[in-house]
Amino acid sequence: MRRLVRNWNCRLLFNAKSGQEIVSHAGIHQEAKTNAIPREKKVIEADKNGYGAKHCMSLVEKYDYENYLCTLLLPRELRRAAFALRAFNVEVSRSVSGHQIEPQIAKMRLKFWHDSIDKCFEPDSQRSYVEDQPVLRELKHTVGSRKLNKVYLRRLVTARERPPTHAFESIRELEEYTEQTFSSLLLLLLEVGGVRDLNADHAASHLGKAQGIATLLRSIPLAGRQQAPCIPLEVLVLHGVSQERIIRSKSDDKGVEDCIFDVASAANTHLKLARQLHDKVPPQVRKIFLSAVATDAYLERLRRANFLLTHKSCVGRDTLLPARLFWKSLLNRF
């Protein structure tokens, strides 16, 4: 293990360093600071100092830690753009989550993100508030340097228009939601890698659904009654279980166990379908799918806990995940 820790990427994973060292490793050039910065040059100087990139990395590290680890292991030339996209996704998600957010306020926030996407695709000659927001500034830089599909970015926002208290009717509806959110982000990362491949797109679609369903399952004990559990109504009716029983998730409730099993099985099916396409996915972008490692690890812990969402092994961080990710990265597998 000590030999592995000498590797730059591995040190980043296990030490979770930030600031100058990580930003430099991410391929972002740093300039010496000046004592006096003219007002009109603050944005330019901030970009030179990598503030926007550091801000994006910090956001992802704080709110999306597993994907933060996965992004650290991407090729250097993809890392900055990947952090920008993941930070944008974090910001959109945070804008509609939390305690007692009024629907009208959530709608206004999403409208802001919709407008911001359009601003990021405007020519550099048209200045706007994008330059003053670090995440949007990084997103605009990514849009300007990569050929990104605006449709995928819009999906990340449009999907969040769904009220958090609105339950899914069926597993298919749940899969459509996760494809809009998680799969769209993976497809954007493929575009950052410059890959146009049908098999890679199919793998991204299946993996996004698997990761999304697993993430929504993990959120049930944390969200409580703030949002409807992700268990579809058709599954609840099949096993005669109420949403309240899902939220409580008692260890001796067989009906709840069966409901969680059905939904987790859907995630596992998509994960297997994604991995079946492994050899057909171009080798240079396989690391984009490292999130499959974290998804697989969670589903396995959930299985061993008899699908009890509140089991201690299912609510805490996976301390072995950095080692698993690094090993899969060395093998270039997901």
UniProtKB/Swiss-Prot annotation:
> Where is it made, tissue-wise?
Expressed in the ventral nerve cord, larval brain, motor neuron axons, imaginal disks, and muscles (at protein level).
A Gene Ontology annotation in the biological process aspect, one of them, is:
mitochondrial respiratory chain complex I assembly
Q: What's the superkingdom here?
A: Eukaryota
Please state where this protein is localized. Answer: Mitochondrion inner membrane; Cytoplasm, Cytosol
Keyword Cytoplasm among UniProt keywords? yes
Q: What does this protein do?
A: Involved in the assembly of mitochondrial NADH:ubiquinone oxidoreductase complex (Complex I) at early stages. Interacts with cytosolic Hsp90 to chaperone the Complex I subunit ND-42 in the cytoplasm.
State whether it acts alone or in a complex, and with which partners, per the record: Associates with mitochondrial complex I assembly intermediates during its biogenesis. Forms a complex including sicily, ND-42 and Hsp83; the complex is necessary to chaperone ND-42 in the cytoplasm before mitochondrial import; the interaction between sicily and ND-42 is direct and occurs preferably between the unprocessed forms in the cytoplasm; the interaction with Hsp83 is direct. Interacts with ND-30; interaction is stronger between the unprocessed forms in the cytoplasm.
What's this protein's name? NADH dehydrogenase (ubiquinone) complex I, assembly factor 6 homolog
Species name: Drosophila melanogaster (Fruit fly)
